[in-house]
């Protein structure tokens, strides 16, 4: 009896890339296919579905500069990674290779093209990421989370399907939890996160903002905040002084459940975060990561803000005073919070993993 077809999933080693890959993997396995993950060494923290024997680490390199030395180093690392990926694929013989963005996807996708293996890339951002842009003209098909991402390029648009962002089972379970309207007598459940890698700006700004709040509102706060290890002591010192009921950690493995329990989220606006806020339907204050060449987080935050589900604040305007004012205004207007939660949900697509799995099987001719 022959083995089931194998689908190789390639993703950068952060949650924003790995979680959609995991969500697709769950659906493909339910359909009787085999899956493996190709990534970098960072992925073990977020591996989830993928046990160690289902993961292949291939060296890659992020483009970190334009000097001849930096470009040469990048070229050498990508070349070595591609050679290893070719050997891996000749051994595994996948039916298709699916990329989810990040520079670690370049070697396996380059190798797949060299071996004439069908390929597909998925991009969750409102602006396509750089690694996916490098691959876009070389792959068999493209999937995007949002409509219109490639409409300005007829050649790419012709092979693009809008699927949404695949959601892990934990997110789908959280999406079934209804938003709890804010009650003046109950705690305000505030969740502060900075993406899968954390964000120092939250440690710099949020404690000062909470220090600005009216004491009556401060006493109602039930705070959960992602804080990097190096920032933990100074953040905790402020909250201890303010006597805030809080839970602080560098990483929350149960973040979907915490999102579901929240009534207001303060966060960066990576593609995965925005998609999960839409799927679960929670109001948010989003602070896009500044300095990105393509301003993808600014565009991502705009998707939720334009729908009425979020307030977007650029980092230059993200001060303790501004955040305190926004939290105070929202806490005083429970109906607005509920309306934002409803609006956010209009952005989410809960069937995205199945839609992407359909496209994968079409590309792989299964």
UniProtKB/Swiss-Prot annotation:
Main location group: membrane
Compartment(s) where it occurs, according to its Swiss-Prot or TrEMBL record: Cell inner membrane
Catalytic activity: di-trans,octa-cis-undecaprenyl diphospho-N-acetyl-alpha-D-muramoyl-L-alanyl-D-glutamyl-meso-2,6-diaminopimeloyl-D-alanyl-D-alanine + UDP-N-acetyl-alpha-D-glucosamine = di-trans,octa-cis-undecaprenyl diphospho-[N-acetyl-alpha-D-glucosaminyl-(1->4)]-N-acetyl-alpha-D-muramoyl-L-alanyl-D-glutamyl-meso-2,6-diaminopimeloyl-D-alanyl-D-alanine + UDP + H(+)
Keywords: Cell cycle, Cell division, Cell inner membrane, Cell membrane, Cell shape, Cell wall biogenesis/degradation, Glycosyltransferase, Membrane, Peptidoglycan synthesis, Transferase
Pathway assigned to this chain's UniProt record: Cell wall biogenesis; peptidoglycan biosynthesis
Sequence positions that bind UDP-N-acetyl-alpha-D-glucosamine: 14-16, 125, 168, 196, 297
Gene Ontology CC terms, in alphabetical order: plasma membrane
Membrane topology: Peripheral membrane protein
Any one GO BP annotation for this protein: carbohydrate metabolic process
Job description of the protein: Cell wall formation. Catalyzes the transfer of a GlcNAc subunit on undecaprenyl-pyrophosphoryl-MurNAc-pentapeptide (lipid intermediate I) to form undecaprenyl-pyrophosphoryl-MurNAc-(pentapeptide)GlcNAc (lipid intermediate II).
Family: Belongs to the glycosyltransferase 28 family. MurG subfamily.
Protein name: UDP-N-acetylglucosamine--N-acetylmuramyl-(pentapeptide) pyrophosphoryl-undecaprenol N-acetylglucosamine transferase
Organism for this UniProt entry: Rhodopseudomonas palustris (strain BisB5)
Gene that specifies this protein: murG
């Amino acid at each position: 009896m022959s083995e089931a077809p194998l689908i190789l999933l390639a993703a950068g080693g952060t949650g924003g890339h790995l979680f959609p890959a995991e969500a697709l993997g769950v659906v493909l396995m339910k359909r009787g296919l085999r899956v493996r993950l190709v990534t970098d060494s960072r992925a073990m923290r977020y591996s989830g579905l993928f046990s160690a024997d289902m993961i292949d680490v291939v060296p890659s390199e992020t483009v970190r500069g334009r000097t001849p030395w930096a470009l040469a180093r990048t070229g050498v690392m990508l070349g070595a990674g591609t050679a290893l990926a070719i050997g891996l694929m000749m051994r595994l013989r996948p039916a298709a290779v699916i990329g989810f963005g990040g520079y670690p996807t370049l070697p396996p996708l380059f190798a797949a093209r060299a071996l004439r293996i069908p390929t597909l890339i998925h991009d969750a951002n409102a602006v396509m990421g750089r690694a996916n842009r490098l691959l876009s003209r070389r792959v068999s098909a493209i999937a995007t989370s949002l409509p219109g991402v490639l409409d300005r390029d007829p050649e790419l648009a012709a092979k693009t399907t809008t699927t949404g962002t695949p959601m892990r089972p934990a997110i789908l379970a959280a999406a079934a939890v209804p938003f709890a309207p804010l009650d003046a007598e109950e705690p305000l459940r505030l969740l502060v996160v900075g993406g899968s890698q954390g964000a120092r700006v939250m440690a710099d700004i949020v404690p000062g903002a909470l220090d600005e709040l009216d004491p009556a509102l401060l006493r109602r706060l039930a705070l959960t905040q992602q804080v990097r290890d190096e920032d933990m002591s100074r953040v905790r010192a402020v909250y201890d002084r303010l006597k805030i009921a809080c839970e602080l950690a560098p990483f929350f493995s149960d973040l979907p459940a915490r999102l579901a329990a929240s009534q207001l989220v303060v966060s960066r606006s990576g593609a995965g975060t925005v998609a999960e806020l839409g799927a679960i339907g929670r109001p948010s204050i989003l602070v896009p990561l500044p300095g990105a060449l393509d301003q993808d987080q600014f565009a991502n935050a705009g998707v939720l803000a334009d729908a009425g589900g979020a307030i977007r604040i650029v980092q230059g305007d993200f001060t303790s005073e501004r955040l305190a004012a926004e939290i105070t205004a929202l806490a005083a207007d429970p109906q607005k919070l509920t309306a934002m939660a409803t609006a956010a949900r209009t952005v989410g697509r809960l069937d995205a993993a199945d839609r992407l799995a359909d496209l994968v099987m079409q590309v792989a001719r299964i």
